[in-house]
């Protein structure tokens, strides 16, 4: 649990057996969670989106693209909590790192500090240069719609104009 909220991850790469922990750090009971070694050394690259200081210089939105956007935007701030998105993203990413490593995965973190300057393109290049089996980008998007809730997952498709050729690989 993070700040009293529960989040779930679905992945063909994650398998747990036994009773799950409530995630409540205040509990004195030991977790009976047992994990298998499903990761078998697969490399997972985790990017905690954003950073303490945005970089408004621009870069292409994708490989070979003419359209450009800021290298790293500021992200959002929690309306209720006041937590900056880059802080929450790193907190979630570090918990995911621990969970994946406990399951036998090798994990590369794009950042382990908020005080970095790593562009979006550089983040993808780091995952690609290490030939990661999966690249997970953690974000906590916001909305001006007060009725909006839930989660969003974005994944590679064969229709991606920048890298559709790797869809089946």
Where are the model-predicted features located?
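A broad, structure-centric signal for solvent-exposed, well-ordered loop/edge residues
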Residues: 16, 21, 53, 160-161
């Amino acid at each position: 649990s993070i700040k009293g909220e529960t989040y779930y991850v679905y992945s063909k790469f994650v398998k747990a057996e036994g009773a799950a922990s409530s995630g409540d750090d205040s509990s004195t009971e030991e977790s009976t969670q047992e994990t298998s070694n499903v990761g078998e050394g697969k490399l997972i690259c985790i990017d905690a989106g954003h950073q303490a200081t945005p970089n408004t210089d621009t870069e292409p939105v994708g490989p070979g693209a003419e359209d450009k956007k800021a290298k790293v935007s500021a992200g959002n701030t929690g309306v209720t909590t006041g937590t900056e998105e880059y802080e929450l993203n790193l907190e979630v990413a570090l918990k995911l790192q621990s969970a994946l490593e406990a399951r036998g995965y090798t994990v590369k973190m794009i950042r382990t500090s908020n005080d970095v300057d790593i562009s979006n393109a550089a983040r993808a290049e780091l995952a690609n240069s290490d030939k990661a089996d999966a690249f997970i980008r953690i974000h906590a998007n916001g909305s001006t719609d007060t009725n909006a809730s839930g989660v969003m997952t974005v994944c590679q498709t064969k229709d991606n104009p920048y890298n559709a050729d790797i869809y089946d690989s």
